[in-house]
Amino acid sequence: MGKIIGIDLGTTNSCVAVLDGGKARVLENAEGDRTTPSIIAYTDDETIVGQPAKRQAVTNPNNTFFAIKRLIGRRFKDDEVQRDVNIMPFKIIAADNGDAWVESRGNKMAPPQVSAEILKKMKKTAEDFLGEEVTEAVITVPAYFNDSQRQATKDAGRIAGLEVKRIINEPTAAALAYGIDKKQGDNIVAVYDLGGGTFDISIIEIDSNDGDQTFEVLATNGDTHLGGEDFDNRLINYLADEFKKEQGLDLRKDPLAMQRLKEAAEKAKIELSSTNQTEVNLPYITADATGPKHLVVKITRAKLESLVEDLIIRTLEPLKVALADADLSVSDINEVILVGGQTRMPKVQEAVSNFFGKEPRKDVNPDEAVAVGAAIQAGVLSGDVKDVLLLDVTPLSLGIETMGSVMTKLIEKNTTIPTKAQQVFSTADDNQSAVTIHVLQGERKQASANKSLGQFNLDGIEPAPRGMPQIEVMFDIDADGILHVSATDKKTGKKQNITIKASSGLSEEEVAQMVRDAEAHAEEDKKFEELVQSRNQADGLVHATKKQVEEAGDALPADDKAKIEAAMSAVEVATKGNDKEAIEKATQELIEASAKLMEIAQAKAQTQGGAQEGAAKQSNATADDVVDAEFEEVKDDKK
C-alpha cells in the first residue's frame, strides 16, 4: 500500500508532509521551498502553480488566482464573496447553481477545480520525494468549515487524483503536531489559528498515559472569512488612499497597479513584524497625461497596528465563546499554540498573550504544524502510528424544521464526531401522504433564522390520522464532518436520503452570526418557543374536539354544539396571530365550552368499557403486588 500524505491546503500558502522513519517530515517543492504559495495562473498554453505563478502575477493579474479557498463551497450572493468581488483583480462570477466561481480567458471554473491545481503540485512534490505514485491524502480544513466547504475540499482532492481518506480540522492537526511527543500527563491546549484567510480557535485536551494518547476537542469556534488577506487589504486600501490624496488617481481601477500594490503591502506587513518602520516604493505605478507616477509611502508598525486593530479584536470573541462552550476558564488552559503565518505579527501575539495571561509557545512552526499533524493523522489511518486517538467535534447544531416553523435539534454543537442521532416525528395533517425533511444548521429556535442546508421528500406514507405515522429521521456525521440525513417510514420501511452537497453553501460569517444571534435573542427565542407550544396545543385541541363532536352526534344538544363551534372558530382565528395570551384565552374558553361534550364522551366510555376497565384494574393490582413484593424483599435484605 502506498503512503498516505498530509496536506495543509491553505488560503495563502500550502504545505505537504509525510511520515518518514516514523517521524512527520515537511517536504520541499521543486523550487526548494517547504511551503508553496496557493496561487494558480492560467496562460495561453499552461497552468502555473506556486512561486512561478506569484512571480508572473503582475503581468497577468486577471488570470492569476489567489485566496481561492475563501470562495470554496460558498454562494456568489454571500456578503463575504461580494466583498471579494470588489477587490480581487480576477473575475468572480455566479454559477448556474448560485455558487461562486471564477473566470479565466472565457473559461468558467469552480473553486475546487482551481484548488485541485495546488493539490496536484503537493501530490507531485510527495511523489518526487517518495519515488512512487501517491493516491491517498489527509487534507486539512478550518475547524469552522461547514458541510458544503468540506465536501468541496474533498471534490478538489478527487479532481487532483487523490482519494481523501480524512478531512481533519487545522487546529486539531496543529495540536497533534505539538502533542505527539508529549508522552505523559494531561494538558488542555488552546490552538489559536490565524491563517491567510481563516481564523479558528480550538480547545483541545491531550491525555498521554503509558504510551496511549487521546486528543479530544472540547470546543471550537471561529470565522472563515478573517485572516492575513484581510490584514493585507487594510494596508492596500491605505496605500491606495494615500496615493489618491497625493496624485488624484485611484489605483483600484488599474488591475496591474493593484497587483503590484498587493505584493508591496504583503512584503511591508512581513517586514513590520521585525522592524518599526518600512517604506513602500513603487516607481511607475501608473501614469496620466502629465507623465508617469510613483508611489512612495513610509509606514510605521504603529500605523499598521492601528489599521488592523479591529480585526485582531474580532478574534477575541470566539475565544470567549469556545472557553464557555468547553465550560473552562482562562486559568484552565495549560498551553497556547499559535498557528498560521499571521500570528507572527507582534500585536497578534500580544493580544493572545494578554487574553490567556501566558506567553504562547514558540516551539511550533506556525507555517508547518498543520501539515505535520495531517501526516500524523495519515499515519494513524495507515496503521504506522499507533496508540493515538483523535476525537473531533461538529462546530454547529444540526436539526430539522418541525411543526410551527421550529428548528428541532438532533445534534448539538461541539458534539464529538463521528456521531449519529435519530428521532421519530409524525404527520401534521390527517391522511398526509408525504413529508418534507428540511435540514437546518444553526442555534436559533425559529427555523427561518437558521441556515437551510437542503431538503427532500419522503412519499408514499399510508393514509392515517395525523400523529399516527412514525417517521424516523436519522442524522449521521462522518469523521470528515460531512452530514448524511435519512428519513424512514417505520411502517412501510420506505426510506429517503440526502448528503449535503456543495451547492448548499453556508458562509461561516452566517454561522458566527447565528451563534451571536442565538445569544442575543435568547429571550426572543424562548418567547417564540412558548408561542409555538401554545399554538400547537390549541390546534391539537381543535382537532380532537371536532372528532368528539362528530362522535357525539345527536347526543350533543344543539346549543352546546353551537357554543363549541364558535369557540373552535375563535381558537382558529387566534392561532393565526402571534399573541400567546389570546391563544391561551381562546383555548381555555374552548375547554369550558366543551364541558358537555366531555360528559357525553366519559359516559359513553364508561358504558362501553366497563368490563375492560375491571380487567385492567385486576391486572394492575396484580402487577402492583408483584412490584411491592420485590420492593419489600429488597428492603428486608437491607435490614
From Swiss-Prot:
Gene3D superfamilies: 1.20.1270.10, 3.30.420.40, Actin, Chain A, domain 4, Substrate Binding Domain Of DNAk, Chain A, domain 1
Annotated Pfam families: HSP70
Keywords annotated in UniProt: ATP-binding, Chaperone, Nucleotide-binding, Phosphoprotein, Stress response
Induction: By stress conditions e.g. heat shock.
Region described as Disordered: spans on this chain: 603-639
Domain of life the protein comes from: Bacteria
Listed Acidic residues bias regions: 625-639
Modified residue annotations for Phosphothreonine: 198
GO molecular function, one term: ATP-dependent protein folding chaperone
Database matches in SUPFAM superfamilies: Actin-like ATPase domain, Heat shock protein 70kD (HSP70), peptide-binding domain
Biased composition (Low complexity): 603-618
Functional note: Acts as a chaperone.
NCBIfam families per record: PRK00290.1, PRK05183.1, prok_dnaK
Database matches in PANTHER family: HEAT SHOCK PROTEIN 70KDA (PTHR19375)
Family: Belongs to the heat shock protein 70 family.
Name assigned to this protein: Chaperone protein DnaK
Organism field: Shewanella sp. (strain ANA-3)
Gene that this polypeptide is encoded by: dnaK
